[in-house]
Amino acid sequence: MASEVRVRFAPSPTGHLHIGGARSALFNYLFAKNQGGMFVLRIEDTDQARNVGQAKEKLLDSLKWLGVEWDESIDVGGEYGPYSSMERLDIYKKHIEQLLNEGKAYYCYMTEEELEAEREAQIARGEMPKYSGRDRDLTEEQRRAYEAKGIKPVVRFRVPEGQVIKIQDAVRGEVSFESDGIGDFVIARKDGVPMYNFAVVVDDHLMKISHVIRGEEHLSNTPRQVMLYEAFGWDVPTFAHASLILNPNRQKMSKRDESIIQFVEQYKELGYMPEAIVNFLALLGWSPVGEEEIFSLEELAAQFSLERVSKAPAVFDTDKLAWMNNQYIKNADLDDVVALALPHLQKAGKLPESLSEEQAEWAKAVISLYQEQLHYGAEIVELTELFFKTEIQYNDEAQEVLNEEQVPGVLSGFLQELEGLDTWDAVSIKGAIKATQKATGQKGKKLFMPIRVATTGQTHGPELPSAIKLIGKEIVTHRLRSLLN
């Protein structure tokens, strides 16, 4: 076993980075940082049918955006490369031949139709379907007969019979599997390309991976991988299987579940902050010491340990993520919040792609009003709607305020004060509200609510004089006149 801690994240380039994959990458990264080890990023691209163009680049971009940096990979190299499975085919071929020569693997000529018929018969008998072992002990003559018919074989691993495979899992403790429940499994396809379970074992061994940290869904692969390690006479790494991630309804998360946003790139596009996503994912199945919930990447790395990774399922609480992102937005520099929110106003057609200096200052001021309450960048479009239209619709709650008997007097008094202003700024508007209070004798809610509702259309909102200033004199006075008429 390698004395140095070496961990890896090995995604398949089949699409965007899923939040489950992002959590696995993060746990590996944090463990490596905590232990002074190395974090390897490897691309498992042997399943050519499922690979998606540009997915490799998107995976790397999403990890970089999160701040999860690797020590060795396809882009930075390293002494244990290549770091892409399809560039390692000669290495796998050599190891498959070794198992064939030692009688630990064999060629299987069963067709898909034969395997399906076998499977259906087993299910009909109430048995767990597994490969029967028909081609386990073929003679050379039988093999030649199949090949004469043009049947291309797969390579299967010969699973030892009557064994108990014990795994000391760093999260779950001892986990046992019966080898008799596992049929001889395929380690190489008909074209010679290895299956995932084989390639991952060869790669992890040759890259000196000390700890395999991944999600619970991989636990069922582990006995197959352990048997391969033992067949080669290699040390088995330490396995650590983190808990399943459940959706907010406490059901197992499915990539087809559209009720929840599941890909890192989507959160980026919505205007979430990478620091918040990292913080949230770290707490999804790992618990720090104490009650604190807000951590930087460095603070997480300083605390992270496998002992505090939970085996109980973790619920992906979207409200908690929105709350956490808001904590980061509240504490961010205003320029960073503008960079997060402004593109969404431009994309929605509220502001032009190219802003004048005056427009940029105005947009910054509007966004600043919502920094305290903004949950993610795209939310700014809905929050700031009142700044981008002349006429506003008053909902029932707003209409109730406007129906109060003191309202006409308050609004006409306020309109008069605004029209008399020489300068249009928050201080002057605050003065106009005070003057209206003096002239009408109204104060508190009786004064402020009608003014807020009439000028913004909302019963709650940002600091009022600043909002009125940014809406603009022409639109504000028009709204007041429309109501009074």
Swiss-Prot record:
It comes from the Bacteria. Its EC number is 6.1.1.17. ATP binds at K255. Pfam families: Anticodon_2, tRNA-synt_1c. InterPro entries: aa-tRNA-synth_I_cd-bd, aa-tRNA-synth_I_codon-bd_sub2, aa-tRNA-synth_I_CS, aa_tRNA-synth_I_cd-bd_sf, Glu-tRNA-ligase_bac/mito, Glu/Gln-tRNA-synth, Glu/Gln-tRNA-synth_Ib_cat-dom, GluQ/Sye. Keywords: Aminoacyl-tRNA synthetase, ATP-binding, Cytoplasm, Ligase, Nucleotide-binding, Protein biosynthesis. A motif ('HIGH' region) lies at residues 11-21. One of its GO terms (molecular function) is ATP binding. It catalyses: tRNA(Glu) + L-glutamate + ATP = L-glutamyl-tRNA(Glu) + AMP + diphosphate. A motif ('KMSKS' region) lies at residues 252-256. It is found in: Cytoplasm. Transmembrane segments: none annotated. GO terms for biological process: glutamyl-tRNA aminoacylation. SUPFAM superfamilies: An anticodon-binding domain of class I aminoacyl-tRNA synthetases, Nucleotidylyl transferase. GO terms for cellular component: cytosol. HAMAP family: Glu_tRNA_synth_type1. Monomer. Catalyzes the attachment of glutamate to tRNA(Glu) in a two-step reaction: glutamate is first activated by ATP to form Glu-AMP and then transferred to the acceptor end of tRNA(Glu). Belongs to the class-I aminoacyl-tRNA synthetase family. Glutamate--tRNA ligase type 1 subfamily. This is Glutamate--tRNA ligase. It comes from Halalkalibacterium halodurans (strain ATCC BAA-125 / DSM 18197 / FERM 7344 / JCM 9153 / C-125). The gene is gltX.
